[in-house]
């Protein structure tokens, strides 16, 4: 299927590593020129050079702190200057979830909570607020928010709250921006294989004495496909949602964790 993405222009926050980088790569392979944005300029420069060499597309790394409105305005303006416009925004800049033991109620300080929400929820809102008028002026756009399956699970109070908030933000934006040609969706990855996974597995092997294969099997114990989803497979879904082919999907949530056992979502 031709996703009709050739020549589109995208901004991917959290794009220097992990799922964000995988999304930037897949978009570029589909013919999209991409700005990847994150905090560390050196990591951005290295990732941009590697992705440009692999895909043959224009890949630019721009530093951003999505907690700061001035920085957000600058990265959107920089994207327009670098690419000549902006058609697609992927919000993937967030504190990683699922790696450490989530804090219990007594351990959740105001600062911990608000810092996490400021990065993911307010950060996504700031980016959309700045990018949407550019897309509306062109009559077309896509905004994809990367959230996570903590939205449907207990066990991480902050993780669940922030991800539910991202889903609510997504639906509100979709209703407001849909008539202007801008579709907004939210994607919920589960535990996903990224470049960090081998290190996580090695640490658990050292702590438990289990074989690496058994550690990974346990990590995917509640995944119905029987293994972890790879970040490239998440990127495939996002590339479709970023395309004109996805016009029938707006304001909805797409889970891409390989299937959660037992739960029924409708």
Protein language model features and the residues they cover:
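Canonical Rossmann dinucleotide-binding motif of NAD(H)/NADP(H)-dependent dehydrogenases/reductases
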Residues: 3-35
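Short C-terminal tail/terminal secondary-structure segment
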Residues: 18-19, 102, 239, 250-266
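The beta1-alpha1 cofactor-binding region of Rossmann-like NAD(H)/NADP(H)-dependent oxidoreductases
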Residues: 41, 63-75, 110
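Conserved mid-core segment of classical short-chain dehydrogenase/reductases
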Residues: 73, 94-114, 137, 158
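Catalytic loop of short-chain dehydrogenase/reductase
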Residues: 95-96, 110, 142-166, 170-179, ...
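Catalytic Tyr-X3-Lys loop
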Residues: 106-126, 140, 144, 166
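Amphipathic alpha-helical dimer-interface segment in Rossmann-like NAD(P)H-dependent oxidoreductases
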Residues: 119-137, 174-175, 243
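Short, small/polar-rich loop/turn modules that mediate ligand/substrate recognition or access, typified
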Residues: 178, 183, 249-251
């Amino acid at each position: 299927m031709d996703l009709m993405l050739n020549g589109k222009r995208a901004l991917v926050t959290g794009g220097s590593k992990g799922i964000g980088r995988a999304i930037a790569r897949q978009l570029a392979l589909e013919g999209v020129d991409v700005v990847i944005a994150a905090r560390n300029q050196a990591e951005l420069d290295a990732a941009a050079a590697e992705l440009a060499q692999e895909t043959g597309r224009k890949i630019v790394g721009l530093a951003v702190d999505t907690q700061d409105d001035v920085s957000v305005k600058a990265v959107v303006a920089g994207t327009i200057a670098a690419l000549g416009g902006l058609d697609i925004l992927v919000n993937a800049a967030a504190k990683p979830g699922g790696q450490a033991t989530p804090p219990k109620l007594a351990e959740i300080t105001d600062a911990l909570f608000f810092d996490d929400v400021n990065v993911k929820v307010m950060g996504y809102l700031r980016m959309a607020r700045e990018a949407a008028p550019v897309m509306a002026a062109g009559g077309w756009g896509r905004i994809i928010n990367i959230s996570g399956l903590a939205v449907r699970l207990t066990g991480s109070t902050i993780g669940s709250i922030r991800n539910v908030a991202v889903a609510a933000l997504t639906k509100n934006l979709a209703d407001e921006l849909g008539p202007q040609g801008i579709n907004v969706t939210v994607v919920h990855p589960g535990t996903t294989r990224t470049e960090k996974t081998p290190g996580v597995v090695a640490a658990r092997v050292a702590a438990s004495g289990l074989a690496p294969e058994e550690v990974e099997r346990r990590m995917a114990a509640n995944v119905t496909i029987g293994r972890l989803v790879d970040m490239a497979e998440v990127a495939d879904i996002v590339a479709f949602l970023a395309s004109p082919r996805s016009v029938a999907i707006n304001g909805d949530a797409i889970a891409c964790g390989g299937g959660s056992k037992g739960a029924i979502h409708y």
